[in-house]
A protein has these predicted regions:
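N-terminal small-domain helix-loop-helix segment of the aminotransferase-like
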Residues: 2-103, 110, 294, 402
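PLP-dependent enzyme catalytic core of the Aspartate aminotransferase-like
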Residues: 233, 346-350, 356-366, 370-402
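PLP-dependent aminotransferase class I/II
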Residues: 236-320, 326-330
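Conserved core of the PLP fold type I
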Residues: 67-199, 215-219, 223-228, 232, ...
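Conserved PLP-binding catalytic core of the aspartate aminotransferase-like
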Residues: 307-308, 321-360, 377, 385
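Short strand-turn motif at the edge of the Rossmann-like AdoMet-binding core
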Residues: 211-213, 242-243
Length: 402
């Protein structure tokens, strides 16, 4: 490989909540017992160094020691347009369709504010990304959950009949669509997106499509942009993207929307501006330009190979060694949504017991109940394989087969 995905990074005391927050007073993930270090498997960032073109772009810009007011450079828009054309086959994207937001959730909230009034019902799929729950629910929107169903092959599927029932009964005119899905890792097929968008068209539902994970597709699968499935989908969808998940840039904060509907785009721009806190950071602009270079594509291809290997290892290990623990193998993202229901029932344990045992040995997973998983945990696999192997060895010895 051209890039290093095997060395262990020491992120302690370097502004990484993934490793520094566990064990702090009041935080749900407690400190491990003596003899164990923390393996960060909860928050969705990576324990890999990013592609070198990003720090190079930032360093080059910081060498010019004036950081005053600025407007986004043409290179910024050109990089986004080129990336979507080369990676997703998108044609016709222009700079006028691209808007800035301080984080994808900020863009989701802005779009909801444009399309809804506080107190309105918004459709989401369950399991539900906890960020939607807080960003929308905490400011007065009512989230209506349509549960995803596992088919006979163990693949998460949308329940279109339930979606329509919920839309009609709750007078819904806005839906949040997560593609790929977090936490389940589903990469939706074209026919699934088409059917969902036809349903939304039928009932005049606008769509906010969170596609921040769209670059992190595992081998054998392909991301289909929501706006690409029909002309109507193109015009009724606000799509949110960012280089942050792809290139481990969450701390730099810099996301963007793609909106083709000029009526909707104008209102999005106004809503974003009204906060007076949503201006682009000059260094995040250069980070995106650095990320979306050809080197970024090579780095991403290698990362996807590593993540595919990690997912294969983890899912195989669970199937062979953890009786009563199940997982639907993700097709994208680097997260597992692990179901411990049968194991807990057989052993007379609760999810609290499982999490406490994990934390005792430093396996810092995330409580899946925050995502509407009754007896689940969400597990981050974006670390060197040796670290993933160590985590599963601890789970084997001290948690599920203790």
């Amino acid at each position: 490989m051209t890039y290093d995905f095997t060395s262990l990074m020491d992120r302690h005391d370097l502004d990484a909540i993934a490793v520094d927050l566990p064990g702090t007073p009041g935080f749900s993930i407690t400190a491990p017992k003596e003899g164990f270090d923390v393996i960060p498997m909860w928050v969705a960032d990576m324990n890999f160094p990013t592609v070198p073109t990003i720090p190079a772009a930032i360093v080059e810009r910081t060498a010019h020691t004036a950081y005053g007011y600025f407007a986004p450079r043409a290179e910024y828009f050109d990089a986004i347009i080129r990336w979507h054309r080369e990676h997703n086959g998108v044609e016709g994207l222009e700079s006028r369709h691209i808007g800035y937001a301080n984080g994808v959730l900020g863009g989701v909230v802005a779009a909801a504010n444009v399309l809804c009034s506080r107190g309105d019902n918004i459709l989401v799929h369950s399991p539900t990304y906890v960020g939607f729950t807080h960003a929308l629910g905490d400011i007065g929107y009512n989230l209506v959950h349509s549960e995803l169903k596992l088919d006979e092959q163990g693949i998460w599927r949308m329940d279109f009949a339930d979606m329509e029932k919920k839309i009609v009964e709750n007078k819904i005119h806005c839906a949040v669509f997560c593609s790929p899905h977090n936490p389940c890792g589903r990469v939706w097929e074209k026919w699934e997106i088409e059917q969902a968008m036809e349903l939304y068209k039928k009932h005049d539902v606008f769509v906010i499509s969170d596609e921040i994970w769209s670059d992190l597709i595992l081998e054998g699968y392909k991301h289909i942009p929501t706006q690409s499935v029909s002309e109507d989908a193109k015009m009724r969808t606000v799509a949110m993207y960012a280089p942050s998940k792809t290139f481990n840039l969450a701390g730099l904060v810099g996301s963007y929307s793609i909106v083709y509907n000029s009526w909707l785009k104008d209102r999005m721009d106004k809503e974003i501006a009204l906060s007076h806190t949503n201006a682009m950071n000059v260094l995040s602009m250069y980070a995106l330009i650095g990320a979306y270079k050809p080197e970024g594509t090579v780095w991403l291809e290698e990362l996807r190979e590593v993540l595919t290997g990690n997912v294969n290892f983890a899912c195989d290990y669970i199937e062979k060694h953890f009786e009563g623990v199940t997982v639907s193998k993700p097709q994208g993202t680097y997260m597992l949504f692990v179901d411990c229901s049968s194991w807990c029932e057989k052993h007379g344990k609760t999810m609290d017991d499982v999490l406490a045992a994990c934390y005792d040995v430093g396996v810092a997973v995330q409580d899946g109940r925050h995502f509407h998983g009754a007896c689940h945990m969400r597990m981050n696999l974006a670390s060197p394989l040796s670290r993933i192997q160590e985590a599963f060895d601890r789970l084997d010895k001290y948690v599920f087969n203790a």
